[in-house]
Amino acid sequence: MSDCQHQLKLFALNSNMKLAKEIAEVMGIELGKCSVSRFSDGEIQINIEESIRGDDVFVIQSTSVPVNEHLMELLIMIDALKRASARTINIVMPYYGYARQDRKARSRNPITAKLVANLLETAGASRVITLDLHAPQIQGFFDIPIDHLMGVPILADYFKSKQLEDIVVVSPDHGGVTRARKLADRLKAPIAIIDKRRPKPNVAEVMNIVGQVAGKTAILIDDIIDTAGTITLAANALAESGAKEVYACCTHPVLSGPAIERIQSSKIKELVVTNSIALPEEKKIDKIVKLSVRPLIAEAITRVYEMKSVSVLFD
Protein backbone atom coordinates (compact mmCIF):
# COMPACT_ATOMS: atom_id res chain seq x y z
CA MET A 1 0.00 0.00 0.00
CA SER A 2 2.93 2.32 0.70
CA ASP A 3 6.65 2.27 1.50
CA CYS A 4 6.00 2.23 5.25
CA GLN A 5 8.60 0.19 7.14
CA HIS A 6 6.05 -1.70 9.22
CA GLN A 7 3.48 -3.94 7.56
CA LEU A 8 -0.25 -3.39 7.92
CA LYS A 9 -2.10 -6.49 9.13
CA LEU A 10 -5.90 -6.57 9.22
CA PHE A 11 -7.71 -9.12 11.39
CA ALA A 12 -11.40 -9.75 11.99
CA LEU A 13 -13.23 -11.50 14.79
CA ASN A 14 -16.75 -12.92 14.75
CA SER A 15 -19.08 -9.92 15.15
CA ASN A 16 -19.11 -8.65 11.56
CA MET A 17 -16.99 -10.82 9.28
CA LYS A 18 -18.85 -9.71 6.14
CA LEU A 19 -17.99 -6.05 6.72
CA ALA A 20 -14.38 -6.98 7.52
CA LYS A 21 -14.06 -8.85 4.22
CA GLU A 22 -15.53 -5.86 2.37
CA ILE A 23 -13.01 -3.53 4.02
CA ALA A 24 -10.12 -5.86 3.14
CA GLU A 25 -11.33 -5.98 -0.47
CA VAL A 26 -11.47 -2.19 -0.71
CA MET A 27 -7.94 -1.96 0.71
CA GLY A 28 -6.64 -4.68 -1.59
CA ILE A 29 -5.27 -6.88 1.19
CA GLU A 30 -6.07 -10.26 2.73
CA LEU A 31 -7.47 -10.66 6.23
CA GLY A 32 -4.91 -11.99 8.70
CA LYS A 33 -5.12 -15.62 9.75
CA CYS A 34 -6.43 -16.30 13.23
CA SER A 35 -8.74 -18.86 14.79
CA VAL A 36 -11.32 -18.35 17.53
CA SER A 37 -12.43 -21.49 19.35
CA ARG A 38 -14.12 -22.48 22.60
CA PHE A 39 -13.04 -24.83 25.35
CA SER A 40 -15.67 -27.27 26.58
CA ASP A 41 -16.64 -24.90 29.40
CA GLY A 42 -17.19 -22.00 26.98
CA GLU A 43 -13.90 -20.16 27.52
CA ILE A 44 -12.59 -18.39 24.42
CA GLN A 45 -9.27 -19.34 22.87
CA ILE A 46 -7.60 -17.32 20.10
CA ASN A 47 -4.62 -18.38 18.03
CA ILE A 48 -2.87 -15.96 15.66
CA GLU A 49 -1.62 -18.10 12.79
CA GLU A 50 0.97 -15.78 11.26
CA SER A 51 3.76 -13.55 12.49
CA ILE A 52 2.77 -9.99 13.36
CA ARG A 53 6.03 -9.00 15.07
CA GLY A 54 6.71 -5.32 14.52
CA ASP A 55 3.56 -4.85 12.43
CA ASP A 56 0.77 -2.28 12.69
CA VAL A 57 -2.26 -4.45 13.40
CA PHE A 58 -5.92 -3.44 12.95
CA VAL A 59 -8.68 -5.59 14.45
CA ILE A 60 -12.29 -5.21 13.27
CA GLN A 61 -14.88 -6.09 15.92
CA SER A 62 -18.21 -4.49 16.82
CA THR A 63 -19.34 -5.24 20.35
CA SER A 64 -22.86 -6.07 19.23
CA VAL A 65 -25.10 -9.00 20.22
CA PRO A 66 -23.90 -11.15 21.94
CA VAL A 67 -22.19 -8.12 23.47
CA ASN A 68 -20.21 -9.81 26.21
CA GLU A 69 -18.96 -12.62 23.95
CA HIS A 70 -17.75 -10.15 21.36
CA LEU A 71 -16.15 -7.87 23.94
CA MET A 72 -14.30 -10.79 25.53
CA GLU A 73 -13.14 -12.01 22.11
CA LEU A 74 -11.72 -8.55 21.45
CA LEU A 75 -9.91 -8.29 24.79
CA ILE A 76 -8.33 -11.72 24.37
CA MET A 77 -7.28 -10.86 20.81
CA ILE A 78 -5.61 -7.65 22.00
CA ASP A 79 -3.70 -9.59 24.65
CA ALA A 80 -2.61 -12.18 22.07
CA LEU A 81 -1.38 -9.45 19.71
CA LYS A 82 0.51 -7.69 22.48
CA ARG A 83 2.26 -10.91 23.50
CA ALA A 84 3.08 -11.60 19.84
CA SER A 85 4.97 -8.27 19.67
CA ALA A 86 2.70 -6.23 17.40
CA ARG A 87 4.08 -2.72 17.00
CA THR A 88 0.66 -1.09 17.35
CA ILE A 89 -2.77 -2.59 18.09
CA ASN A 90 -5.53 -0.52 16.50
CA ILE A 91 -9.10 -1.46 17.36
CA VAL A 92 -11.78 -0.80 14.74
CA MET A 93 -15.15 -0.83 16.52
CA PRO A 94 -17.88 0.21 14.08
CA TYR A 95 -20.33 -0.22 16.98
CA TYR A 96 -19.17 0.49 20.54
CA GLY A 97 -21.35 -1.55 22.89
CA TYR A 98 -22.21 -0.24 26.37
CA ALA A 99 -21.99 3.34 25.02
CA ARG A 100 -25.45 4.15 26.41
CA GLN A 101 -24.12 3.63 29.94
CA ASP A 102 -22.01 6.78 29.72
CA ARG A 103 -23.08 8.39 33.01
CA LYS A 104 -24.75 7.62 36.30
CA ALA A 105 -28.45 7.81 35.46
CA ARG A 106 -29.30 7.17 39.10
CA SER A 107 -27.55 6.53 42.40
CA ARG A 108 -25.13 3.59 42.55
CA ASN A 109 -25.13 3.02 38.77
CA PRO A 110 -21.88 2.05 37.02
CA ILE A 111 -20.41 4.01 34.10
CA THR A 112 -19.86 0.98 31.91
CA ALA A 113 -18.76 2.91 28.80
CA LYS A 114 -15.77 4.10 30.81
CA LEU A 115 -15.11 0.59 32.11
CA VAL A 116 -14.97 -0.75 28.54
CA ALA A 117 -12.49 2.00 27.62
CA ASN A 118 -10.34 1.01 30.61
CA LEU A 119 -10.48 -2.67 29.63
CA LEU A 120 -9.38 -1.96 26.05
CA GLU A 121 -6.47 0.18 27.20
CA THR A 122 -5.35 -2.22 29.92
CA ALA A 123 -5.46 -5.13 27.47
CA GLY A 124 -3.02 -3.22 25.26
CA ALA A 125 -4.92 -1.26 22.59
CA SER A 126 -2.90 1.56 21.01
CA ARG A 127 -5.78 3.30 19.25
CA VAL A 128 -9.53 3.03 18.66
CA ILE A 129 -11.43 3.84 15.46
CA THR A 130 -15.19 3.95 15.99
CA LEU A 131 -18.36 5.21 14.37
CA ASP A 132 -21.08 7.45 15.82
CA LEU A 133 -20.62 7.01 19.55
CA HIS A 134 -23.90 7.36 21.43
CA ALA A 135 -22.30 10.12 23.49
CA PRO A 136 -19.34 11.98 21.90
CA GLN A 137 -17.84 12.62 25.35
CA ILE A 138 -16.95 8.91 25.52
CA GLN A 139 -13.87 9.96 23.55
CA GLY A 140 -12.68 11.53 26.80
CA PHE A 141 -12.85 8.17 28.59
CA PHE A 142 -9.73 7.09 26.68
CA ASP A 143 -6.10 8.04 27.27
CA ILE A 144 -5.14 6.66 23.86
CA PRO A 145 -6.00 8.23 20.48
CA ILE A 146 -9.58 7.69 19.29
CA ASP A 147 -10.89 8.51 15.83
CA HIS A 148 -14.63 9.17 15.91
CA LEU A 149 -16.10 8.75 12.42
CA MET A 150 -19.57 9.92 11.38
CA GLY A 151 -22.26 8.06 9.48
CA VAL A 152 -24.24 11.18 8.53
CA PRO A 153 -22.44 11.76 5.18
CA ILE A 154 -23.30 8.21 4.06
CA LEU A 155 -26.95 8.63 5.06
CA ALA A 156 -27.13 12.09 3.48
CA ASP A 157 -25.77 10.85 0.15
CA TYR A 158 -28.46 8.17 0.05
CA PHE A 159 -31.30 10.61 0.68
CA LYS A 160 -29.88 13.04 -1.89
CA SER A 161 -29.98 10.24 -4.46
CA LYS A 162 -33.72 9.79 -3.83
CA GLN A 163 -34.39 13.44 -4.76
CA LEU A 164 -37.05 13.85 -2.10
CA GLU A 165 -38.95 17.15 -1.90
CA ASP A 166 -40.08 19.30 1.04
CA ILE A 167 -37.81 17.52 3.51
CA VAL A 168 -37.78 18.12 7.25
CA VAL A 169 -35.19 16.30 9.36
CA VAL A 170 -36.57 15.20 12.72
CA SER A 171 -34.75 14.37 15.94
CA PRO A 172 -36.68 11.82 18.04
CA ASP A 173 -35.52 13.58 21.23
CA HIS A 174 -33.68 16.68 22.44
CA GLY A 175 -30.40 14.78 22.78
CA GLY A 176 -30.23 14.08 19.05
CA VAL A 177 -30.63 17.66 17.82
CA THR A 178 -26.95 18.07 16.89
CA ARG A 179 -27.07 14.90 14.80
CA ALA A 180 -30.30 16.00 13.10
CA ARG A 181 -28.84 19.41 12.34
CA LYS A 182 -25.81 17.82 10.62
CA LEU A 183 -28.07 15.80 8.34
CA ALA A 184 -30.34 18.80 7.76
CA ASP A 185 -27.37 20.97 6.76
CA ARG A 186 -26.33 18.42 4.14
CA LEU A 187 -29.87 18.15 2.80
CA LYS A 188 -30.49 21.92 3.09
CA ALA A 189 -33.62 21.23 5.13
CA PRO A 190 -35.18 22.55 8.35
CA ILE A 191 -35.36 20.46 11.50
CA ALA A 192 -38.10 19.46 13.93
CA ILE A 193 -37.87 17.83 17.36
CA ILE A 194 -40.00 15.24 19.10
CA ASP A 195 -40.55 16.19 22.74
CA LYS A 196 -40.89 12.86 24.53
CA ARG A 197 -40.92 11.49 28.04
CA ARG A 198 -39.54 8.06 28.91
CA PRO A 199 -41.32 6.59 31.98
CA LYS A 200 -39.00 3.54 32.12
CA PRO A 201 -36.19 2.00 30.01
CA ASN A 202 -37.17 1.08 26.42
CA VAL A 203 -40.60 2.70 26.82
CA ALA A 204 -41.08 6.12 25.24
CA GLU A 205 -44.15 8.33 25.07
CA VAL A 206 -44.36 11.01 22.39
CA MET A 207 -45.63 14.27 23.83
CA ASN A 208 -45.28 17.04 21.26
CA ILE A 209 -43.69 17.98 17.93
CA VAL A 210 -41.63 21.16 17.82
CA GLY A 211 -41.45 22.40 14.23
CA GLN A 212 -43.46 22.27 11.01
CA VAL A 213 -44.03 18.79 9.55
CA ALA A 214 -47.45 19.01 7.86
CA GLY A 215 -47.21 18.33 4.13
CA LYS A 216 -43.50 17.51 4.36
CA THR A 217 -41.33 14.44 3.88
CA ALA A 218 -40.02 13.70 7.36
CA ILE A 219 -36.67 11.98 7.92
CA LEU A 220 -36.13 10.75 11.47
CA ILE A 221 -32.50 10.24 12.47
CA ASP A 222 -30.98 8.50 15.49
CA ASP A 223 -27.63 6.91 16.24
CA ILE A 224 -29.05 3.62 17.55
CA ILE A 225 -32.40 1.93 17.01
CA ASP A 226 -32.81 -0.76 19.65
CA THR A 227 -36.37 -1.90 20.39
CA ALA A 228 -37.67 0.75 17.93
CA GLY A 229 -40.20 2.08 20.43
CA THR A 230 -38.96 5.67 20.20
CA ILE A 231 -38.60 5.79 16.42
CA THR A 232 -41.94 4.13 15.60
CA LEU A 233 -43.91 6.26 18.05
CA ALA A 234 -42.23 9.32 16.56
CA ALA A 235 -43.05 8.18 13.02
CA ASN A 236 -46.69 7.60 13.88
CA ALA A 237 -46.89 11.01 15.58
CA LEU A 238 -45.41 12.67 12.49
CA ALA A 239 -47.95 10.96 10.23
CA GLU A 240 -50.78 12.04 12.52
CA SER A 241 -49.44 15.61 12.35
CA GLY A 242 -49.68 15.67 8.57
CA ALA A 243 -46.29 14.49 7.28
CA LYS A 244 -46.86 13.08 3.79
CA GLU A 245 -44.09 10.46 4.11
CA VAL A 246 -41.91 9.31 7.00
CA TYR A 247 -38.43 7.87 6.55
CA ALA A 248 -36.10 6.87 9.37
CA CYS A 249 -32.36 6.31 9.51
CA CYS A 250 -29.69 5.31 11.98
CA THR A 251 -26.06 4.24 12.02
CA HIS A 252 -26.42 1.28 14.37
CA PRO A 253 -29.37 -1.13 13.81
CA VAL A 254 -29.41 -3.04 17.11
CA LEU A 255 -33.07 -4.01 16.44
CA SER A 256 -33.66 -6.15 19.51
CA GLY A 257 -36.87 -7.62 20.93
CA PRO A 258 -40.01 -6.38 19.15
CA ALA A 259 -38.15 -3.95 16.86
CA ILE A 260 -38.86 -5.65 13.52
CA GLU A 261 -42.55 -6.12 14.27
CA ARG A 262 -42.86 -2.49 15.37
CA ILE A 263 -41.13 -1.21 12.24
CA GLN A 264 -43.30 -3.36 9.98
CA SER A 265 -46.53 -2.05 11.52
CA SER A 266 -45.41 1.59 11.79
CA LYS A 267 -45.81 4.55 9.45
CA ILE A 268 -42.12 4.32 8.49
CA LYS A 269 -41.86 3.98 4.70
CA GLU A 270 -38.18 3.07 4.73
CA LEU A 271 -35.58 2.53 7.46
CA VAL A 272 -32.06 3.30 6.25
CA VAL A 273 -29.23 1.79 8.30
CA THR A 274 -25.51 1.05 7.95
CA ASN A 275 -23.78 -2.29 8.29
CA SER A 276 -21.91 -1.33 11.46
CA ILE A 277 -23.84 -4.24 12.99
CA ALA A 278 -24.42 -7.46 11.05
CA LEU A 279 -28.14 -8.09 10.50
CA PRO A 280 -29.31 -11.71 10.75
CA GLU A 281 -31.57 -12.99 7.98
CA GLU A 282 -34.75 -12.78 10.08
CA LYS A 283 -34.23 -9.01 10.46
CA LYS A 284 -33.76 -8.30 6.74
CA ILE A 285 -37.19 -6.97 5.83
CA ASP A 286 -38.21 -4.99 2.75
CA LYS A 287 -38.53 -1.75 4.71
CA ILE A 288 -34.85 -1.83 5.71
CA VAL A 289 -32.20 -0.42 3.36
CA LYS A 290 -28.61 -1.19 4.35
CA LEU A 291 -25.69 1.07 3.38
CA SER A 292 -22.05 0.07 3.73
CA VAL A 293 -19.47 1.92 5.82
CA ARG A 294 -16.63 -0.03 4.18
CA PRO A 295 -15.12 2.89 2.18
CA LEU A 296 -15.16 5.18 5.21
CA ILE A 297 -13.49 2.67 7.53
CA ALA A 298 -11.03 1.49 4.87
CA GLU A 299 -9.93 5.07 4.29
CA ALA A 300 -9.57 5.69 8.04
CA ILE A 301 -7.41 2.58 8.48
CA THR A 302 -5.22 3.56 5.52
CA ARG A 303 -4.74 7.09 6.81
CA VAL A 304 -3.84 5.94 10.32
CA TYR A 305 -1.34 3.43 8.94
CA GLU A 306 0.25 5.95 6.58
CA MET A 307 0.37 8.62 9.32
CA LYS A 308 -1.95 10.94 7.38
CA SER A 309 -4.64 13.20 8.78
CA VAL A 310 -7.94 11.50 9.59
CA SER A 311 -9.78 14.75 10.30
CA VAL A 312 -10.89 15.11 6.67
CA LEU A 313 -13.17 12.11 7.28
CA PHE A 314 -14.98 13.85 10.15
CA ASP A 315 -16.65 16.46 7.93
Swiss-Prot record:
EC number(s) reported in the record: 2.7.6.1
Positions annotated to bind ATP: 41-43, 100-101
Keyword annotations: ATP-binding, Cytoplasm, Kinase, Magnesium, Metal-binding, Nucleotide biosynthesis, Nucleotide-binding, Transferase
Subcellular location: Cytoplasm
Required cofactor(s): Mg(2+)
Homology family: Belongs to the ribose-phosphate pyrophosphokinase family. Class I subfamily.
Record text on cofactor binding: Binds 2 Mg(2+) ions per subunit.
Catalytic activity line of the entry: D-ribose 5-phosphate + ATP = 5-phospho-alpha-D-ribose 1-diphosphate + AMP + H(+)
BP terms from Gene Ontology: 5-phosphoribose 1-diphosphate biosynthetic process; purine nucleotide biosynthetic process; ribonucleoside monophosphate biosynthetic process
Listed HAMAP family: RibP_PPkinase_B
Protein name, UniProt field: Ribose-phosphate pyrophosphokinase
Binding site for Mg(2+) 1: 134
Recorded GO CC terms: cytoplasm; ribose phosphate diphosphokinase complex
Gene Ontology molecular functions: ATP binding; kinase activity; magnesium ion binding; ribose phosphate diphosphokinase activity
Gene source species: Bacillus caldolyticus
Binding site for Mg(2+) 2: 173
Role played: Involved in the biosynthesis of the central metabolite phospho-alpha-D-ribosyl-1-pyrophosphate (PRPP) via the transfer of pyrophosphoryl group from ATP to 1-hydroxyl of ribose-5-phosphate (Rib-5-P).
Pathway(s) this gene product operates in, as recorded in its UniProt entry: Metabolic intermediate biosynthesis; 5-phospho-alpha-D-ribose 1-diphosphate biosynthesis; 5-phospho-alpha-D-ribose 1-diphosphate from D-ribose 5-phosphate (route I): step 1/1
PANTHER family in the cross-refs: RIBOSE-PHOSPHATE DIPHOSPHOKINASE FAMILY MEMBER (PTHR10210), RIBOSE-PHOSPHATE PYROPHOSPHOKINASE 1, CHLOROPLASTIC (PTHR10210:SF41)
UniProt: D-ribose 5-phosphate binding residues: 198, 222, 226-230
Top-rank taxon: Bacteria
Quaternary organization: Homohexamer.
EC category: transferase
Main location, first listed in the record: cytoplasm
Catalytic residue list: 196
Gene assigned in the entry: prs
